[in-house]
């Protein structure tokens, strides 16, 4: 997931984008469970502290058929300073998913943003670095090998602007960009042979240059024999990107024939660092629903075998990572349900798209 960085932006953002779109209104009347409408798994994320929230549980159990641990399956949580591994919180989420009868998706094994001190301290000792890297993947991916149906093996390898690939502790310790990604996938394949292994990134549809760089990387890895088995499209959508840009990327991504996971959907109503947004909220909602409708339509247009899952990065607006921190004014509404758990317009957009 996008962490410790500014809200989504695109060099192609247009202030006029969305003008004339159909009005965005919350659904009325009886609400059908989203998981009953969609012909594929519909996911959301969980933190262990949310599992006892009865209102959150009601929404999750009604509408979703897959769970991704939002943070507590990442290295930042699991790997301790002494090299030991902590599994208390991710185990609770795994048990919760099992008892609820929903799929569990693993996120994420290797991420440039989490260059843990345990690894930075040994980056110049190649044999030890390799051994510790392989041990970590073996123990983490192997722990839930009978339950987890897929993993984000490498998260966010492409530079923000699409100019290249991220230099990180993993590339330095394992001999280069391709080398670290290939090794991570090979080790994940050994540890979790039944899981579908994903390369996951953000802004692929928001920034065409980055989307193209990501797909070139996928092609190169496949030619090198890496067991990349799926494409993770995070879809933290910039609502101001031009119409058709999302569908264009999805059409390019489908050419590999790999399963595609919309893995972290949200759509902020804010401009995030650009000029103050003085437009009426209704206009921004229209843009938001139009872009999410385009994403859902593009996903529905994929061959059924390529529709791995469609995951929303949070349940209620108040659960969103976009609403955390001292600068949150409580006004953003990037998810399917509002703070009180009532459906937002985005819920109706997905219900309509998935029912076609």
Give the predicted meaning of each segment.
Residues 68-72, 92-196, 202-204, 269-272:
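Substrate-binding cleft and catalytic face of glycoside hydrolase catalytic domains
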Residues 45-56, 75-88, 158-160, 204-213, ...:
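Acidic-and-aromatic substrate-binding clefts and catalytic sites of carbohydrate-active enzymes
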Residues 178-186, 190, 194-196, 211-216, ...:
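Glycoside hydrolase catalytic-domain groove-lining segments
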Residues 36-91, 96, 103, 109-124:
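N-terminal substrate-binding region of glycoside hydrolase catalytic domains
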Residues 19-45:
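C-terminal segment of N-terminal export signals and the immediately downstream linker at the start
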Residues 67, 97, 151, 231, ...:
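Conserved, mostly hydrophobic/aromatic
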Residues 143, 152, 157-162, 166-174, ...:
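Aromatic-rich peripheral "rim/lid" segments of glycoside hydrolase catalytic domains that contact
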Residues 1-15:
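N-terminal secretory signal peptides and thylakoid transit peptides that target proteins
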């Amino acid at each position: 997931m996008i962490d410790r960085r500014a809200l989504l932006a695109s060099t192609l953002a247009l202030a006029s984008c969305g003008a004339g779109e159909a009005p965005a209104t919350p659904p009325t009347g009886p609400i059908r469970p989203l998981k009953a409408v969609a012909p594929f798994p519909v996911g959301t994320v969980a933190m262990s502290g949310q599992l006892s929230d009865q209102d959150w549980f009601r929404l999750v159990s009604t509408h979703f058929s897959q769970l991704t641990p939002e943070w507590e399956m990442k290295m930042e949580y699991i790997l301790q300073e002494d090299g030991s591994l902590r599994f208390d919180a991710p185990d609770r989420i795994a048990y919760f998913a099992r008892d609820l009868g929903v799929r569990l998706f693993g996120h994420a094994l290797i991420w440039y943003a989490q260059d843990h001190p345990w690894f930075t301290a040994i980056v110049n000792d190649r044999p030890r670095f390799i051994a510790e890297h392989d041990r970590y993947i073996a123990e983490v991916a192997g722990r839930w090998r009978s339950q987890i149906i897929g993993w984000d093996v490498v998260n966010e390898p492409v530079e923000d602007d699409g100019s290249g690939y991220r230099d990180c502790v993993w590339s330095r310790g394992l001999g280069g960009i391709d080398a670290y990604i290939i090794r991570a996938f090979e080790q994940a394949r050994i540890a979790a042979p039944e899981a579908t292994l994903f390369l996951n990134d953000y802004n692929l549809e928001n920034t065409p240059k980055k989307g193209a760089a990501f797909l070139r990387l996928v092609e190169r890895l496949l030619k090198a024999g890496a067991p990349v088995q799926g494409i993770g499209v995070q879809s933290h959508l910039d609502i101001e990107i031009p119409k058709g840009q999302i569908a264009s990327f999805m059409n390019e991504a489908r050419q590999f024939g790999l399963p595609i996971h919309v893995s972290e959907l949200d759509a902020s109503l804010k401009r995030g660092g650009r000029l103050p947004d003085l437009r009426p909220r209704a206009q921004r909602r229209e843009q938001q629903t139009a872009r999410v409708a385009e994403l859902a339509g593009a996903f529905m247009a994929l061959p059924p075998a390529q529709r791995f899952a469609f995951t929303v990065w949070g349940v209620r607006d108040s659960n969103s990572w976009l609403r955390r921190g001292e600068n949150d004014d409580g006004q953003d509404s990037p998810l399917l349900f509002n703070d009180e758990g009532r459906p937002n317009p985005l819920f109706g957009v997905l219900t309509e798209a998935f029912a076609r």
